[in-house]
Regions:
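Conserved glycine-rich cofactor-binding loop
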Residues: 7, 14-16
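Short C-terminal tail/terminal secondary-structure segment
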Residues: 94, 99, 150, 230, ...
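Substrate-binding pocket helix/loop in short-chain dehydrogenase/reductase
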Residues: 98-102, 106-111, 206, 210
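Active-site helix of classical SDR
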Residues: 125, 161
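Residue(s) in the substrate-gating loop at a strand-loop-helix junction
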Residues: 145
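Short, small/polar-rich loop/turn modules that mediate ligand/substrate recognition or access, typified
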Residues: 177-181, 239-241
Length: 254
């Protein structure tokens, strides 16, 4: 897909991977709705930076766990941008709970993680389908995780939600074809503020361990993941239903 004069929604775009993706799209001439749930200042800053590339960029608040908010998000894209070609389902959440501590996992953990990480992408895709089709077809990219492939990560509910998202990606690719392609990226450890806050003092030792484990001896940055997302958007039109690991070769080891 050629991105110039196209339009995109990126959820959770105030920080991290979402921010990097919104800016990468804008740099290539794609207007963008910069969605956020709580990170208003970050989203508005991202929108300003994206607009500096000469495209239209609008920050829009919506909690993807709420179906009505997802529909309002797509309506904003139609109102502000006039079309929709790309949906990047990046918004996500987790809890940092040791896997062996089963008693610490409560209903709220399951409900919130699945509401954002699984229902959110489904609801956004469902809401976006008509506008994507009216715009000539398009692309949905879900931001998953290697946690959904190997069941190691911040918590068991998080791993399960990403495994389910991988399955959802394949199901949506089947039912939305041939006009809409659906793929996912599965990052490994992503260096940055989100994991640093969640892991605290354990962040640097875990990061070093992940670097040592990866065949390429480094972990992801948000920009690495954004590049993987764009490779799916702008690459072969025959790729759909694919989950692309982006983890420096952690899955194959050194």
């Amino acid at each position: 897909m050629e991105l110039k004069h196209k339009a995109a929604i990126v959820t959770g775009a105030g920080t991290g991977v979402g921010r990097a993706t919104a800016l990468a799209l804008a740099e290539r001439g794609c207007s963008v709705i910069v969605n956020y749930s709580r990170s208003r200042e970050g989203a508005e800053a991202t929108a300003r930076e994206a607009a500096a590339f000469g495209v239209k960029a609008v920050a829009f608040q919506a909690d993807v766990a709420d179906d009505g908010a997802c529909r309002a998000l797509v309506a904003a894209a139609e109102r502000e941008l006039g079309r929709l070609d790309v949906l990047v389902n990046n918004a996500g959440t987790t809890r940092f709970i040791p896997h062996a501590d089963l008693e610490r996992v409560g209903d709220d953990d399951w409900n919130q993680i699945f509401a954002v990480n699984l229902k959110g992408p489904f609801q956004c895709a469902r809401a976006a389908r008509p506008l994507l089709e009216r715009s000539g077809g398009g692309m949905i990219v879900n931001v998953s995780s290697v946690a959904g492939l190997v069941a190691t990560g911040s918590s068991i509910p998080y791993c399960a939600s990403k495994a389910a998202l991988n399955n959802l990606t394949i199901a949506l690719a089947r039912v939305l074809a041939p006009r809409i392609r659906v793929n996912a990226v599965a990052p490994g450890f992503i260096a940055g503020e989100w994991l640093a806050q969640g892991l605290g003092a354990a962040y640097e030792p875990i990061k070093q361990a992940m670097e040592a484990r990866a065949a390429l001896h480094r972990v992801c940055t948000p920009q690495d993941v954004a590049a993987a997302i764009l490779s799916l958007v702008t690459g072969s039109d025959l790729v759909t239903g694919h989950v692309l690991p982006c983890e420096g070769g952690m899955l194959i080891g050194s």
